[in-house]
Amino acid sequence: HPTGVVPPEYRRRALVREEFHGVEVLRTWIYATPNRGRVKRSAGYASFALSATLWGQLHVRPADVVIATSPQLLCGAAGYVIASARRRPFVLEVRDLWPESIVAVGALPAGHPDIRGLEIVERQLYRAARAIVVVTDAFKTRLVERGVSASKLHVMKNGVDLARFVPAPRATALRTRLGLGDRFVASYVGTHGMAHGLDTVLDVAKRLKARDDLRFLFVGEGAERARLQARVEKERITNAVLLGVLPRDQMNEIYATTDLCLVTLRKSELFTMVIPSKIFEIAAMARPILLSVDGEARAIVEASGGGVFTPPEDVERMARAIVGFVDDRSRGVAMGERGRAYVSREFDRDALARRYLDVLHGVVAAARSTA
């Protein structure tokens, strides 16, 4: 709940049972607050860990294995407690390196007591896990450097549901509603957070404001959104539109409206190990990518032929790249087609899910053999 607003159907309820595509989901109470301020944010993290641990113990049906995902790191801790209490093998899924990424975005300095405490939790989870699933090769390398056994590490990169994300015409109802006409639309879709370097995109929009054939679209929520909106209004960046968060089922229309998708992170050595999962959805929609994330993500986009790289936080290079796409629209169309073909071959979510399931079967078999 990045805005601190809990949907009415969940308010003042300790536990809500739901079903999602045949899977039972237990939604537990959380202290929801706007994603601003370390103390309140930490309280939100801790409240979920405690409620998930409690209700997980009482209501989750018998299982063969317990999987927990991080971040945030206390989710992993909740899974570990439940697995230990039930004497079941524990699998940790690492989608971001906490608390290292907290330091990387400048939220807390290295050596801060909170960071040291999280590092203790992190090390314990790595020791306790029967298997650790990471989403990039670089994450695996970093954890091996920190003493985690390579034998328990498995790289499972994100993929895409190719049946859900299907290329569509750019003449959408959203384009009409926003009065975009045939203008070229460069979009950022996703979390508006400290890590995402969106001031750079606004700097680019401001620089290119004279181009009436170009608009910038921001879709999403996050800790930085209100500040970014205030900046747009104060500096009169009239070619930038911040839509806020839209329902997940409108994602295809958003991508279809877009001529170029922007994927950005701040300049940090840590982020060279990150692969933003949105690049797979964008490619599946046959939209070109302008990527400002170096490292593994860059290697994927360049190998696909579905996009271009500009250095993180480089306003001049990003502006030039965007103008190049505006002036030669056929280039972006061709890149989008190559990107779709590439993810269809390499990042089909069904195939990746089968590999993940093989890992879980191996964990369960090993646990039973030593029981």
For each of these PLM feature ranges, what is it?
Residues A303, V308-V315, G324-S330:
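Conserved acidic donor-binding segment of nucleotide-sugar-dependent glycosyltransferases
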Residues K209-G220, R225-E253:
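Nucleotide-activated donor-binding/catalytic signature segment of Leloir-type glycosyltransferases, i.e.
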Residues L180-H196, L202-A205, L217:
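Conserved donor-binding/catalytic core segment of Leloir-type glycosyltransferases
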Residues A138, G159:
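Carbohydrate-associated surface elements
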Residues T53-Q57, L74-A77, V81-A85, P99, ...:
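Membrane-proximal helix-turn-helix segments that form the acceptor-binding/catalytic region
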Residues L260-V263, E281-S292:
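Short hydrophobic beta-strand element within catalytic cores of glycosyltransferases
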